[in-house]
């Protein structure tokens, strides 16, 4: 559908947002320690510098809200957001090949701060969605009690629920019980 790097970056963006309180598996903030940032970095195969500092932790936590905005923006707003992010970072896209990955785009140097790389890589991936008129693949979970986000990579764009808290099943059970109560 999209390049592997685009899909991976979008899924990493959703995973980052879903570390927020209320969106995470635990319901608590899951990005509170330097080790949490390091685990996120390794888990999503980021490359480049990792400072492993309190400052970096604060910066990555702060960028979550800006990344979240991509999941709720209109196509025009997302395009403006992408342009603003790329301009502020003085992004210069270039093709790179490293660590067993085929050619893909990087837009900031490897020594750029991790939070900046997250935001710029997310913006580059979102630009693919904007150009393909597929921004609707970035969604907020349809469950009333969930604030998680998701990337819908299904062919028919039918995914409605996140993978964080069993939301689809809980919603279906609740609807079933409501129907039964009406019929009882």
What are these regions (language model features)?
Residues 154-156, 175:
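C-terminal structured interaction module
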Residues 166-183:
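Basic DNA-binding region of bZIP-type proteins
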Residues 157-168:
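Cysteine-rich micro-motifs
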Residues 140-145, 164-166:
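Short, cysteine/histidine-rich loop/knuckle motifs that typically chelate Zn2+
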Residues 1-140, 147-151, 184:
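Short helix-coil boundary/hinge micro-motifs
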């Amino acid at each position: 559908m999209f390049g592997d790097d685009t899909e991976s970056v979008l899924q990493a963006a959703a995973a980052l947002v879903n570390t927020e309180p209320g969106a995470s598996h635990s319901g608590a903030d899951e990005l509170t320690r330097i080790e949490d940032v390091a685990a996120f970095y390794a888990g999503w195969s980021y490359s480049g510098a990792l400072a492993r500092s309190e400052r970096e932790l604060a910066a990555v936590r702060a960028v979550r809200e800006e990344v979240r905005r991509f999941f709720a923006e209109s196509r025009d707003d997302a395009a403006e957001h992408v342009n603003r992010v790329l301009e502020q970072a003085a992004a210069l896209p270039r093709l790179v090949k490293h660590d067993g990955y085929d050619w893909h785009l990087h837009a900031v140097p490897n020594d750029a701060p991790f939070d900046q790389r997250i935001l710029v890589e997310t913006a580059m991936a979102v630009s693919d969605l904007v150009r393909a008129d597929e921004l609707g693949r970035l969604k907020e979970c349809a469950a009333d009690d969930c604030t998680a986000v998701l990337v819908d990579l299904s062919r028919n764009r039918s995914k409605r629920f996140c993978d964080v808290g069993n939301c689809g099943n809980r919603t279906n059970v609740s609807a079933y019980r409501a129907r039964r109560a009406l019929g009882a």
